[in-house]
Regions:
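Active-site-adjacent bridging/hinge elements
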Residues: 1, 65-71, 238-246
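A generic structural signal for short coil/turn motifs at secondary-structure boundaries
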Residues: 9-13, 256-258
C-alpha cells in the first residue's frame, strides 16, 4: 500500500500545486499459477499565473510604481487569476499466467558433516548423504494481461481579458474546458519457455492484444464521443539465461480498425566475454515503427483551441 501527498506554495502569486497519489499492490507466486495486480490513483491540481506582467518588476523594480513601492515575490502582478489545471487518473493493472510443465528429480551428494568428528580426527573420510528433491520445470505459459484506465483533464479560468487567446470558440470571458479518456486493454499470449531442456536455447512468445478507447470532448451544444479499437498480433524471441549472449526481439503489427497499418519492432542484444583479466560488454539496440499519432494530436476541443485532423491517419 502506498499513499503520498505533496503541496507546493509557489514563489509567485497563483502558483501553488498539490499532488495526491494512492496505490495498492498484490501478488501471488506459485509453481504453476502466478499473479501480480496494482491499483493506482492520481490527482494533481496546478494553479496558473501565466507569468509576471512585466519583467521590470524583477530587473528594474525602481521603474515600477515610480519607485514608491517595494515588491515581494508574492505581490508582483501576474497575468492570470483564478486559473487552474486539474488532472485525475486511475488505472487497474492485472497480469497472470498458468504454467504447464513436468516434475523431475534432482540428486545432490553432500558430506554428512559432524563438527565433533571433524575436530576429533579430520583424517577420517566423511560419510556422504544423497539428497533427492523434486522440482517443477515449466514448459509452456498461458498469459493474460488486462489494464483499465480512466483519465480526466479540466482547465478553468474565471476571468479572461480580450485578446488573451487567439480564439474563443464557446465563451469570450471565461473557460471551463474538460475531456475524459477511458480505455480497456487485454493481451492474451502463449509462451514456450527457455531452458526447459538443453535444446530450448531461447524462449518464444506469441500474443494478440485488443484495446478499446473512448474519448469525450466538449462541443458547442453537447459533448462528443470518439470510440476507437486497436487489434495487434505480435511475438517475442528472447534469450535471457546464460552468461555470454542475451538478446530480445519483439514485434507487433496492427490488423484491424485504427491499428491497421501500424507496426513496431524493437531488439536489443548484449555480448559478454573475457579479455585478459577483465570482462568486455557489447550492447546493441534497434527500433523501427510506423504508428498513428495519439488521439489528442488528431482531435482536441477547448474554448481556445479546436482541431480535428483526420488526414493524420494517412
Amino acid at each position: 500500500f502506498n499513499i503520498d501527498y505533496l503541496y507546493g506554495r509557489g514563489y509567485y502569486q497563483n502558483q501553488s500545486t498539490s499532488n495526491f497519489n494512492a496505490g495498492i499492490f498484490a501478488s501471488y507466486i506459485g509453481n504453476k499459477y502466478q499473479m501480480q495486480a496494482v491499483y493506482n490513483n492520481f490527482t494533481m491540481k496546478m494553479n496558473e499565473n501565466g507569468g509576471i506582467q512585466d519583467d521590470r518588476y524583477i530587473t528594474r523594480p525602481e521603474d515600477m510604481a515610480e519607485g514608491k513601492k517595494e515588491y515581494e515575490s508574492t505581490t508582483i502582478p501576474v497575468k492570470l487569476e483564478q486559473t487552474s489545471n486539474k488532472n485525475k487518473d486511475f488505472y487497474v493493472y492485472l497480469t497472470h499466467r498458468y504454467r504447464l510443465g513436468f516434475t523431475r528429480e534432482t540428486t545432490t551428494v553432500e558430506d554428512a558433516k559432524s563438527p565433533k568428528r571433524a575436530v576429533a580426527n579430520d583424517s577420517v573420510p566423511l560419510a556422504k548423504d544423497t539428497i533427492i528433491t523434486e522440482e517443477f520445470v515449466p514448459v509452456t505459459s498461458f498469459i493474460h494481461t488486462m489494464k483499465v484506465e480512466r483519465a480526466r483533464h479540466k482547465f478553468s479560468s474565471a476571468k479572461e481579458t480580450e485578446g488573451q487567446y487567439p480564439n474563443a470558440y464557446f465563451n469570450e470571458v471565461a473557460s471551463r474546458d474538460s475531456t475524459t479518456a477511458f480505455s480497456v486493454k487485454n493481451v492474451f499470449g502463449i509462451a514456450l519457455l527457455e531452458g526447459f531442456n538443453k535444446y530450448a536455447k531461447a524462449g518464444l512468445t506469441a500474443y494478440i492484444s485488443h484495446k478499446f478507447s473512448r474519448y469525450e470532448l466538449m462541443d458547442t451544444l453537447s459533448r462528443t464521443n470518439f470510440d476507437e479499437q486497436e487489434i495487434f498480433v505480435g511475438g517475442e524471441l528472447a534469450k535471457r539465461q546464460g552468461k555470454t549472449l542475451h538478446y530480445n526481439v519483439n514485434g507487433e503489427v496492427g490488423i484491424m480498425d485504427k491499428a491497421l497499418g501500424q507496426f513496431r519492432v524493437n531488439a536489443d542484444l548484449d555480448l559478454n566475454f573475457r579479455l585478459w583479466k577483465d570482462t568486455v560488454n557489447f550492447y546493441a539496440r534497434g527500433y523501427v515503427s510506423n504508428t498513428l499519432p495519439s488521439f489528442y494530436m488528431r482531435h482536441y476541443h477547448s474554448n481556445q483551441y479546436y482541431w480535428d485532423t483526420e488526414n493524420m491517419n494517412k
